[in-house]
Amino acid sequence: MSKADIVVGIQWGDEGKGKIVDKLCENYDYVCRSAGGHNAGHTIWVDGIRYALHLMPSGVLNKQCINVIGNGVVVNPDVLISEMAQFENLEGRLFISDRAHLNLNHHALIDQARERLKGDKAIGTTGKGIGPSYEDKISRNGHRVGELLEPEKLCENLMKDFELKKTYFDVLGIAMPSYDEILKDLKRFKEVLAPYITDTTRMLWKALDEDKKVLLEGAQGSMLDIDHGTYPYVTSSTTISAGALSGLGLNPKEIGKVIGIVKAYTTRVGNGAFPSEDLGEDGEKIGLIGKEIGVSTGRKRRCGWFDAVAVRYTARLNGLDTLSLMKLDVLDGFESVKICKAYEYKGQEIDYVPCDLENAKPIYEVMEGWDKVAGIRDYDLLPENAKKYIKRLEELSGVKVGYISTSPEREDTIIL
């Protein structure tokens, strides 16, 4: 029996998981999404063409891969159908768990209305309705993908739900959709998605029993984890490696190696603590060179320096075996680069992540910059200062770097 490997983001998301999964999946038979929804965005560049994925696993660009959307994902049928239209011959290559929960239009309307009402205390959600979808799931009022196979019955149940929520909808200023509108959409969803809906847990058990190679693709980042992230400025799912197990129906004995994806600097979308954020020229420069615009939201990402304290924390949470260092080329040309090696917290220097991270200030180590790493595919050809930077990140995080990305292109990846 084979074991599944996991790729997980270990900052605040947007680390470059899509590129590394796309690179790795040529060695895997299955690539699987386990959590989140279309709030997560993966960008992949192949031969100069940009692909933006939100629900589809990143293995879809490799035709030998079978792609699985697991039970832990919340699926918006409209978004998924739109993404599927970019690709040909998906039957037999894409499967959706019948146990995955649905994300529908009213979830997004609730999300957006609540954010407006919170004003300056808004979480900064993507407005895609992911939180409300998970709320319905946890309160046992949700609906699952498998229910799309009986659209009339699902429509009746949704109308009953809406009637119960009528007062809440009125407060938020949301108009209740009509039965006919909903049924029309549900029938369309069934027509397109029915061939792809199945029990993906049993499928993966069988694959592992047959020694197939399986890669689990995390969404978002560990610092956004519902339990271990910067609460309440977090997502609504478990984004650490443990979540990949429940999100696909696997057990701990079925896991092989865990690869942590990390940028050579740090970014964050939305509100919440970010100790190493740089609000000056360097932060602006990083964002400009790195094209730090959210794939799902179109919002500018906040930018700052590598936070080794946070990475060491998430490395332990995830049980990392190796790091994949992304976007090293973005730091090309900086005279010096900084690493947050510790925090100043309530008058003391600490080397851990407190639950009130907003009260921590960065303590930096400054290193000399380098000229250019962009496009380099051989570690020995990297500038010495870039090598010193990588080595220092390994020392501070406690994890060896196994992959280095030097451009958005698939092939510009150093494998150590």
Swiss-Prot record:
Binding site for Mg(2+): D14, G41
Residues holding GTP: 13-19, 41-43, 301, 327-329, 405-407
Entry keyword set: Cytoplasm, GTP-binding, Ligase, Magnesium, Metal-binding, Nucleotide-binding, Purine biosynthesis
Binding locations of IMP: D14, E15, G16, K17, N39, A40, G41, H42, T126, R140, Q220, T235, R299
Matches recorded under Pfam families: Adenylsucc_synt
Catalytic activity: IMP + L-aspartate + GTP = N(6)-(1,2-dicarboxyethyl)-AMP + GDP + phosphate + 2 H(+)
Active site per the UniProt annotation: D14, H42
Function in brief: Plays an important role in the de novo pathway of purine nucleotide biosynthesis. Catalyzes the first committed step in the biosynthesis of AMP from IMP.
Name of the protein described by the UniProt record: Adenylosuccinate synthetase
The species this protein was found in: Campylobacter lari (strain RM2100 / D67 / ATCC BAA-1060)
